[in-house]
A protein has these predicted regions:
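Carbohydrate-active catalytic/glycan-binding domains of CAZyme proteins
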Residues: 1-187
C-alpha cells in the first residue's frame, strides 16, 4: 500500500477543495510498476483542517496510523481491522493527540521504526519546525502512546528533516555495506 496527502477538488478547474483540507489517499502495487498499480481512493478524510504526513505501523495484531493534523498536530489512532485501508468500513480509536507538541511546539513528518535489539520497543521521529529537525520519541506499549526520549545514546545532526527511516538489522546493514562498490569513507 502506498499513501500520500492530496487536496481533492470538487471540479476539474480546481476551484473548491472537497471538505476544505487535505486527505490521505492510497493505492496498491505488488512491485511498484505501472502494470500492478491500482488507485485505491480515500484512506483518511482530513475534513476542514486536513491531514498530511502519515506513517503506518503494524504490531501485535493492530494497525496504527501516526498522522499530522493541521489542527491537532500529530495524532495516533489504532484499529484491528484486517482491511485497515478501507475508509468506508474501518473504525479507528484515538490513542494519543498532540504528540510532541508540549516540548517541541509545531511538529510534523512522523517516522516510526522498530528497535531490533529490544522486543516491543518502537521509535518515533517528529520534525520540530523550523529547527532543529527530527526529535526522537519512544514507546514500549503502542496502546499507551509515545514518550520523549531523553538519552545521550543517540545523535542526530541539526536540520535532519522528515523523510523515511528504513529499519535494518545489523546483518542487513552489513550486507548493504559489503555490497558497496567503493567505501563511503575516504582516508
Amino acid at each position: 500500500i502506498v499513501y500520500w496527502s492530496s487536496n481533492v477538488y470538487e471540479d476539474e478547474a480546481h476551484t473548491s477543495v472537497v471538505g476544505g483540507g487535505s486527505d490521505i489517499m492510497y493505492g496498491v502495487t505488488t512491485d511498484f510498476t505501472q502494470e500492478t498499480w491500482e488507485y485505491g481512493g480515500l484512506f483518511l478524510d482530513g475534513g476542514s483542517a486536513g491531514w498530511i504526513d502519515t506513517n503506518i505501523l503494524q504490531a501485535n495484531g493492530k494497525t496504527y496510523h501516526i498522522t499530522k493534523s493541521n489542527s491537532e498536530q500529530i495524532i495516533m489512532e489504532s484499529t484491528e481491522a484486517k482491511d485497515w485501508w478501507n475508509y468506508e468500513t474501518t473504525e479507528w480509536t484515538r490513542v494519543q493527540s498532540n504528540i510532541g507538541q508540549s516540548r517541541f511546539g509545531s511538529v510534523e513528518g512522523p517516522a516510526t521504526f522498530t528497535d531490533h535489539s529490544q522486543e516491543n520497543r518502537w521509535y518515533l521521529f517528529v520534525d520540530d519546525l523550523p529547527t532543529p529537525g527530527y526529535q526522537p520519541m519512544v514507546s514500549t506499549n503502542l496502546d499507551e502512546g509515545w514518550e520523549y526520549l531523553d538519552s545521550s545514546d543517540y545523535f542526530l545532526t541539526t536540520y535532519t528533516k522528515h523523510g523515511g527511516v528504513i529499519s535494518l538489522t545489523k546483518a542487513q546493514y552489513d550486507a548493504l555495506r559489503n555490497a558497496d562498490a567503493e567505501s563511503a569513507v575516504k582516508e
